[in-house]
Amino acid sequence: CVSGENGGPVANRFQVASAITSSSYVSHHTAFEYYGIIDQVFYEVYVGSEARFRDFEFDGYTYHYIKSQLKEGIESPEFGGGVRITDKERTIVDSIKDINLIAGLEEVLSCIVAVNGIDESKMLKYLSVYDSAFLYQKTGFIFSEYQTDLSISDEFIKICKEKSGNS
Protein backbone atom coordinates (compact mmCIF):
# COMPACT_ATOMS: atom_id res chain seq x y z
CA CYS A 1 0.00 0.00 0.00
CA VAL A 2 3.03 2.32 0.07
CA SER A 3 4.82 3.60 -3.03
CA GLY A 4 8.51 2.73 -3.30
CA GLU A 5 8.93 5.87 -5.35
CA ASN A 6 7.80 8.50 -2.86
CA GLY A 7 6.65 6.64 0.26
CA GLY A 8 3.05 7.78 -0.20
CA PRO A 9 0.05 5.49 -0.15
CA VAL A 10 -0.87 3.77 -3.39
CA ALA A 11 -4.30 2.56 -2.27
CA ASN A 12 -7.19 4.97 -1.75
CA ARG A 13 -9.17 5.13 1.50
CA PHE A 14 -11.85 2.75 0.18
CA GLN A 15 -9.25 0.11 -0.71
CA VAL A 16 -7.50 0.53 2.64
CA ALA A 17 -10.81 0.12 4.48
CA SER A 18 -11.61 -3.04 2.51
CA ALA A 19 -8.26 -4.62 3.41
CA ILE A 20 -8.16 -4.03 7.18
CA THR A 21 -9.60 -7.48 7.96
CA SER A 22 -10.75 -10.36 5.75
CA SER A 23 -14.38 -9.33 6.38
CA SER A 24 -14.04 -5.53 6.28
CA TYR A 25 -16.07 -3.31 3.97
CA VAL A 26 -16.85 0.37 3.44
CA SER A 27 -20.08 1.41 5.14
CA HIS A 28 -22.35 4.23 6.27
CA HIS A 29 -21.33 7.77 5.36
CA THR A 30 -18.17 6.57 3.60
CA ALA A 31 -20.24 4.38 1.26
CA PHE A 32 -22.30 7.43 0.29
CA GLU A 33 -18.99 9.16 -0.55
CA TYR A 34 -17.89 6.20 -2.70
CA TYR A 35 -21.15 6.33 -4.66
CA GLY A 36 -20.69 10.06 -5.31
CA ILE A 37 -23.79 10.99 -3.32
CA ILE A 38 -21.76 13.36 -1.15
CA ASP A 39 -19.54 15.95 -2.81
CA GLN A 40 -17.64 16.85 0.33
CA VAL A 41 -14.68 14.68 1.40
CA PHE A 42 -14.81 13.59 5.02
CA TYR A 43 -11.74 12.40 6.87
CA GLU A 44 -13.62 9.78 8.87
CA VAL A 45 -13.82 6.35 7.21
CA TYR A 46 -16.46 3.93 8.51
CA VAL A 47 -15.56 0.27 8.17
CA GLY A 48 -17.86 -2.65 8.90
CA SER A 49 -16.13 -5.85 9.97
CA GLU A 50 -16.87 -9.11 11.73
CA ALA A 51 -13.40 -8.96 13.29
CA ARG A 52 -12.80 -6.12 15.73
CA PHE A 53 -9.96 -3.68 15.09
CA ARG A 54 -8.82 -0.53 16.84
CA ASP A 55 -9.60 2.79 15.22
CA PHE A 56 -6.48 4.20 13.57
CA GLU A 57 -5.20 7.02 11.39
CA PHE A 58 -3.55 6.57 8.00
CA ASP A 59 -2.74 9.18 5.38
CA GLY A 60 -4.90 11.83 7.07
CA TYR A 61 -7.98 9.62 7.48
CA THR A 62 -9.32 8.09 10.69
CA TYR A 63 -10.68 4.57 10.19
CA HIS A 64 -13.53 3.63 12.54
CA TYR A 65 -14.65 0.10 13.34
CA ILE A 66 -18.37 -0.63 13.00
CA LYS A 67 -19.56 -4.05 14.20
CA SER A 68 -20.92 -6.00 11.25
CA GLN A 69 -24.42 -7.28 11.94
CA LEU A 70 -25.35 -8.53 8.46
CA LYS A 71 -23.58 -10.45 5.73
CA GLU A 72 -26.15 -9.35 3.15
CA GLY A 73 -25.77 -6.29 0.96
CA ILE A 74 -21.99 -6.21 0.64
CA GLU A 75 -20.64 -6.07 -2.89
CA SER A 76 -17.35 -5.80 -4.74
CA PRO A 77 -17.88 -3.37 -7.63
CA GLU A 78 -16.38 -4.31 -10.99
CA PHE A 79 -13.14 -2.37 -11.51
CA GLY A 80 -13.30 -1.37 -7.83
CA GLY A 81 -9.70 -2.37 -7.08
CA GLY A 82 -10.66 -4.75 -4.30
CA VAL A 83 -13.19 -2.44 -2.64
CA ARG A 84 -15.92 -4.17 -0.63
CA ILE A 85 -18.86 -1.92 0.13
CA THR A 86 -22.48 -1.94 1.23
CA ASP A 87 -24.94 -1.48 -1.63
CA LYS A 88 -26.98 1.72 -1.65
CA GLU A 89 -30.00 0.19 0.07
CA ARG A 90 -27.94 -1.37 2.86
CA THR A 91 -26.11 1.95 3.24
CA ILE A 92 -29.46 3.71 3.68
CA VAL A 93 -30.74 1.19 6.25
CA ASP A 94 -27.46 1.24 8.21
CA SER A 95 -27.38 5.04 8.18
CA ILE A 96 -30.95 5.26 9.48
CA LYS A 97 -30.19 2.62 12.13
CA ASP A 98 -27.14 4.53 13.36
CA ILE A 99 -28.48 8.01 12.59
CA ASN A 100 -27.23 9.61 15.82
CA LEU A 101 -23.87 7.83 15.91
CA ILE A 102 -22.34 8.80 12.60
CA ALA A 103 -23.83 11.52 10.43
CA GLY A 104 -26.90 12.98 12.08
CA LEU A 105 -30.41 13.41 10.73
CA GLU A 106 -29.83 16.30 8.32
CA GLU A 107 -26.83 14.66 6.63
CA VAL A 108 -28.54 11.26 6.34
CA LEU A 109 -31.69 12.84 4.87
CA SER A 110 -29.68 14.76 2.26
CA CYS A 111 -27.92 11.52 1.28
CA ILE A 112 -31.15 9.52 1.04
CA VAL A 113 -32.92 12.04 -1.20
CA ALA A 114 -29.87 12.06 -3.52
CA VAL A 115 -30.02 8.29 -4.12
CA ASN A 116 -31.56 7.33 -7.45
CA GLY A 117 -33.62 4.19 -7.95
CA ILE A 118 -33.99 2.72 -4.46
CA ASP A 119 -34.81 -1.00 -4.58
CA GLU A 120 -37.62 -1.42 -2.05
CA SER A 121 -37.29 -5.21 -1.94
CA LYS A 122 -33.64 -4.90 -0.87
CA MET A 123 -34.59 -2.33 1.75
CA LEU A 124 -37.27 -4.65 3.15
CA LYS A 125 -34.84 -7.58 3.15
CA TYR A 126 -32.29 -5.66 5.24
CA LEU A 127 -34.98 -4.31 7.56
CA SER A 128 -36.24 -7.87 8.03
CA VAL A 129 -32.78 -9.18 8.94
CA TYR A 130 -32.28 -6.41 11.51
CA ASP A 131 -35.78 -7.19 12.82
CA SER A 132 -36.12 -3.92 14.77
CA ALA A 133 -39.56 -2.34 15.16
CA PHE A 134 -37.90 1.02 15.87
CA LEU A 135 -35.83 0.79 12.67
CA TYR A 136 -38.98 0.04 10.66
CA GLN A 137 -40.63 3.03 12.35
CA LYS A 138 -37.75 5.43 11.58
CA THR A 139 -37.48 4.18 7.99
CA GLY A 140 -41.23 4.38 7.42
CA PHE A 141 -41.38 7.91 8.79
CA ILE A 142 -38.45 9.16 6.69
CA PHE A 143 -39.69 7.49 3.52
CA SER A 144 -43.26 8.70 4.01
CA GLU A 145 -41.94 12.28 4.24
CA TYR A 146 -40.03 11.86 0.94
CA GLN A 147 -42.32 9.30 -0.69
CA THR A 148 -43.03 11.34 -3.83
CA ASP A 149 -39.44 12.54 -4.31
CA LEU A 150 -38.08 9.00 -3.98
CA SER A 151 -40.93 7.25 -5.85
CA ILE A 152 -41.59 4.96 -2.89
CA SER A 153 -44.70 2.80 -3.04
CA ASP A 154 -47.60 2.97 -0.61
CA GLU A 155 -47.00 -0.74 0.03
CA PHE A 156 -43.46 -0.06 1.33
CA ILE A 157 -44.76 2.59 3.76
CA LYS A 158 -47.58 0.25 4.84
CA ILE A 159 -45.15 -2.62 5.57
CA CYS A 160 -42.91 -0.31 7.62
CA LYS A 161 -45.92 0.87 9.64
CA GLU A 162 -47.15 -2.69 10.22
CA LYS A 163 -43.70 -3.90 11.32
CA SER A 164 -43.10 -0.93 13.61
CA GLY A 165 -45.59 -2.27 16.14
CA ASN A 166 -46.10 -0.04 19.15
CA SER A 167 -42.61 1.45 19.34
Task: Tell me what each language-model feature is.
Residues C1-E72:
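Short gly/ser-rich loop at a beta-strand->alpha-helix junction or flexible surface loop bordering the NTP-binding
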Residues S76-S167:
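Hydrophobic alpha-helical interaction segments
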